Curated annotation (Swiss-Prot):
GO molecular-function term, one example from the UniProt record: rRNA binding
Gene: rpsE
Protein name: Small ribosomal subunit protein uS5
Protein family according to the UniProt entry: Belongs to the universal ribosomal protein uS5 family.
Example of a GO cellular component annotation carried by this entry: small ribosomal subunit
Domain topic, free-text comment: The N-terminal domain interacts with the head of the 30S subunit; the C-terminal domain interacts with the body and contacts protein S4. The interaction surface between S4 and S5 is involved in control of translational fidelity.
Keyword match RNA-binding: yes
């Protein structure tokens, strides 16, 4: 076989291995549909309907992703949103069953306040969107408050902003150049 053909086959095998690994990770994810919206476009001949799906995926161990997608059928929209969400996974630091510290997430007119809670408190969150994202990321004890816009997508983006701003004690110490081992002795 020619050298080009061998190189092509090696690349193809690498891609198969990457896809296999991606599918293993995707199998561990839990998925929830937060909202389905009917979209109408009025044209000369009448109204054209499509559907928009807002989906959240997570492994309940600190990985979370969300996405929206549109399609002519509900099932297609959900499927497209799931694929997009799985590609946009983000790692969130969790301490035990709660978050490391207070934080505020902002997106547009939405503000979302997150505060750590003691074990057994549960998720104190108003609205399906915020509760869903916190459950799927694996946070079981947290106090929250939503301010401003309560639209599902805005709340989810505000929650994600807040969660992505979280840092563990070790990460903060490393950023500040402090050695925690010396401090604790």
């Amino acid at each position: 076989m020619s050298q080009i053909r061998l190189t092509f086959l090696k690349e193809k095998n690498k891609m198969k291995a990457i896809k296999k690994e991606f599918n293993k990770k995707a199998a561990l994810l839990e998925e929830k549909v937060v909202k389905i919206n009917r979209i109408t476009k009025v044209v000369k001949g009448g109204a054209r309907f499509r559907f928009s799906a807002l989906v959240v995926v997570g492994d309940k161990k600190g990985q979370i992703g969300f996405a929206t997608a549109k399609a002519k059928e509900i099932v297609e929209a959900i499927k497209k949103a799931l694929e997009k969400a799985k590609k946009q996974l983000v790692r969130i630091p969790i301490v035990g069953t709660t978050i490391p510290h207070d934080t505020i997430g902002r997106f547009g007119a939405s503000k979302f306040f997150l505060k750590p809670a003691s074990k057994g408190t549960g998720i104190v969150a108003g609205g399906k969107a915020a509760r869903t994202i916190l459950e799927l990321v694996g946070i079981n004890d947290v106090l929250t408050k939503t301010f401003g816009s309560r639209t599902s997508i805005n709340v989810i983006r505000a929650v994600m902003d807040g969660l992505q701003s979280l840092r563990t004690k070790e990460e903060v110490a490393k950023l500040r150049g402090i050695n925690l081992a010396k401090k604790e002795q």
